[in-house]
């Protein structure tokens, strides 16, 4: 069983996923479209894909396309996802899910009404630390988790200026001010991807940027944002708390590790720094760094990374870690020696989506889970603008079926 897929966006990030979608035997045909047509054509030529569409709308109108994978600028995801679902297409979306609560609610409603597959490609779902902690949580080794931390620590000087210039064109500074808490899913998704909880309230503090270079400047920002660093404390359902840091001006080697996590339970805990990770309980400390160390899939000077800033290339070469070994057996043989990325997550995410569409089952990072990874950050940003006021976070509830189970009947493409 196979389906056809259209790549929406053909930039740096999209091209690396296109390779995997093209290799997966569950996808029969791959197309591309981009607002810069030359990029779509280049992707088609490099991978010998089926062809391009002149626009997103043309792609949605085509009966030759069953599903779309959205890799556009982050503030455009919500409306594009909703448009695709309403056109009858399954959707894979890069993070975040959306930038407004109403968009999130509308996406969930559309998934319920259509029975189509929606999946957000949150890489932290397969971050080695999250995989390790998820296994410990399933074993009951943490006891009751009462506190956790997730940090997405990525300095603007380490590749983000180049990335925003590539995607934003002449007006890149207006978009480079994207609010840090509107990009919360790597940090929140890493924490909640290990423990089945959700945030219920938040108090957030933002640090006003003082670089003075036109980035994070309300006079320029299309988001009216001048926070470059933000810290939020979330209350979790059932008790306990979660601290999330989103830092964009920070002396930290994000090219070594840009996301790091900690979980504390009544029986055990896990802590992570840049180059080491430890499991701790009352009996002592165990260094588990080797279990979550990624194996590279290509060199950072590989020609396929020519358009990627050197400071960002580590995210596109990292393969699986030993802790992934019991997950990779499901991957198709076509992925052997294929590129991976973001700490070994790319191949697993692609396979999750292909399996969900072809089998009609709920993927791990489904619409309801994506909402729990995304909406808390949107509410946190509002809290920061209100001097840290504690705000309630609406929850969209649990998915109607468990992960891996068949979705309710609808006019599915299969």
Where do the language-model regions lie?
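Glycine-centered short loops/turns at secondary-structure junctions
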Residues: 88, 115, 140, 239, ...
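Predominantly a Rossmann-like dinucleotide-binding segment in NAD(P)-dependent oxidoreductases
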Residues: 124-225
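Conserved SAM-binding strand-loop segment of SAM-dependent methyltransferases
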Residues: 49-56
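Glycine- and charged-residue-rich phosphate/anionic-cofactor binding loop of Rossmann-like
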Residues: 28-29, 334-338, 355-373
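Beta-strand-loop-alpha-helix segment that lines the small-molecule cofactor/substrate pocket
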Residues: 62, 66-67, 73-74, 78-126, ...
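N-terminal Rossmann-like dinucleotide-binding module
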Residues: 1-47
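C-terminal capping/lid region of NAD(P)-dependent oxidoreductase domains
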Residues: 116, 143-147, 173, 383-414
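Contiguous beta-strand/loop segments that form the cofactor/metal-binding neighborhood of enzyme cores
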Residues: 182-307, 339, 346-363, 377-381, ...
């Amino acid at each position: 069983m196979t389906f056809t897929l259209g790549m929406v966006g053909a930039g740096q990030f999209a091209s690396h996923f296109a390779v995997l979608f093209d290799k997966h035997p569950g996808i029969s045909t791959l197309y591309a479209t981009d607002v810069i047509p030359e990029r779509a054509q280049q992707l088609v030529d490099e991978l010998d894909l089926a062809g391009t569409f002149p626009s997103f709308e043309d792609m949605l109108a085509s009966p030759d396309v069953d599903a779309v994978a959205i890799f556009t600028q982050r503030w455009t995801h919500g409306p594009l996802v909703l448009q695709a679902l309403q056109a009858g297409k399954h959707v894979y979306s890069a993070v975040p899910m959306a930038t407004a609560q109403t968009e999130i609610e509308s996406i969930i409603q559309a998934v319920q009404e259509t029975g189509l597959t929606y999946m957000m490609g949150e890489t932290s779902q397969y971050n080695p630390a999250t995989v390790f902690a998820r296994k410990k949580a399933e074993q009951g080794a943490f006891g009751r988790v009462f506190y956790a931390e997730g940090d997405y620590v990525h300095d603007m000087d380490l590749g983000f200026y180049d990335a925003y210039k590539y995607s934003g064109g002449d007006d890149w500074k207006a978009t480079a001010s994207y609010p840090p808490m509107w990009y919360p899913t790597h940090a929140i998704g890493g924490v909640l991807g290990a423990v089945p909880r959700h945030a219920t309230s938040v108090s957030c503090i933002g640090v006003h940027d003082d670089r003075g270079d036109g980035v994070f400047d309300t006079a320029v920002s299309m988001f009216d944002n001048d926070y470059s660093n933000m810290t939020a404390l979330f209350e979790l359902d059932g008790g306990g708390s979660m601290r999330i840091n989103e830092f964009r001006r920070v002396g930290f080697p994000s090219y070594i590790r840009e996301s790091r996590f900690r979980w504390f339970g009544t029986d055990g805990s896990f802590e992570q720094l840049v180059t080491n990770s430890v499991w701790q309980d009352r009996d002592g400390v165990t260094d588990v760094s080797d279990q979550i160390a990624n194996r590279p899939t290509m060199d950072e000077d590989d020609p396929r990374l020519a358009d990627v800033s050197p400071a960002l290339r580590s995210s596109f070469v990292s393969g699986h870690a030993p802790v992934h070994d019991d997950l990779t057996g499901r991957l198709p043989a076509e992925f052997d020696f294929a590129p991976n990325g973001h700490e070994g997550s790319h191949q697993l995410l692609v396979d999750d989506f292909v399996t969900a569409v072809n089998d009609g089952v709920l993927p791990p990072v489904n619409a309801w889970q994506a909402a729990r990874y995304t909406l808390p950050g949107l509410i946190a940003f509002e809290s920061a603008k209100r001097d840290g006021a504690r705000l309630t976070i609406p929850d969209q509830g649990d998915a109607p079926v468990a992960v891996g189970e068949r979705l309710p009947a609808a006019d599915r493409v299969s």
